[in-house]
């Protein structure tokens, strides 16, 4: 096992372990992204979660590092059912440059995530939907409609997040 993955192994899912340190290392050595993408496919749920966390942190500043893994994200990793992975995959999907066909696929994935048992996954999916609509205003009406629906049926946290996102989306559509 690669040393980077070893540093993310062990413990339980209540801790991010060395994810922050690993993200810093990968920012300095972007070639190590491939190691994190190997780890996210591990059978170990702790390692999967921490690799997803580190990748998500790296791509806040360097979203272009996701591009070589776009197909894998869309076709395989987005289907991982582990909630701690999903809540990191959602913002990654929103950071990808997407064709119209891929955009449609990502919207469907994220809408599926809004039905997840985890309220964190739901909230992250709502945020990712809004982020995509900010970037592509053509999607504003559809995303606004979905967020309005989620505000009605969601948890208190989803309602609060949804209202905040909806306010920003409404402002965008009037610009």
Tell what function each PLM region has.
Residues 1-175:
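Alpha-helical scaffold domains
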């Amino acid at each position: 096992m690669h040393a980077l993955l070893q540093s993310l192994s062990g413990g339980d899912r209540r801790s991010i372990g060395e994810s922050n340190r690993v993200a810093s290392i990968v920012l300095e050595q972007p070639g190590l992204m491939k190691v994190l993408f190997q780890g996210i496919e591990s059978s170990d749920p702790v390692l999967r979660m921490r690799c997803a966390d580190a990748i998500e942190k790296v791509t806040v500043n360097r979203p272009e590092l996701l591009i070589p893994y776009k197909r894998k994200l869309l076709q395989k990793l987005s289907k991982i059912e582990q909630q701690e992975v999903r809540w990191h995959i959602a913002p990654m999907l929103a950071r990808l440059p997407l064709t119209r066909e891929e955009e449609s696929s990502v919207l469907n994935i994220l809408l599926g995530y809004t039905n997840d048992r985890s309220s964190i996954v739901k909230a992250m999916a709502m945020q990712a939907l809004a982020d995509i609509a900010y970037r592509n205003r053509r999607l504003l009406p559809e995303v606004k409609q979905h967020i309005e629906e989620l505000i009605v049926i969601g948890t208190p946290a989803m309602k609060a997040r949804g209202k905040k996102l909806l306010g920003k989306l409404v402002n965008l559509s009037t610009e």
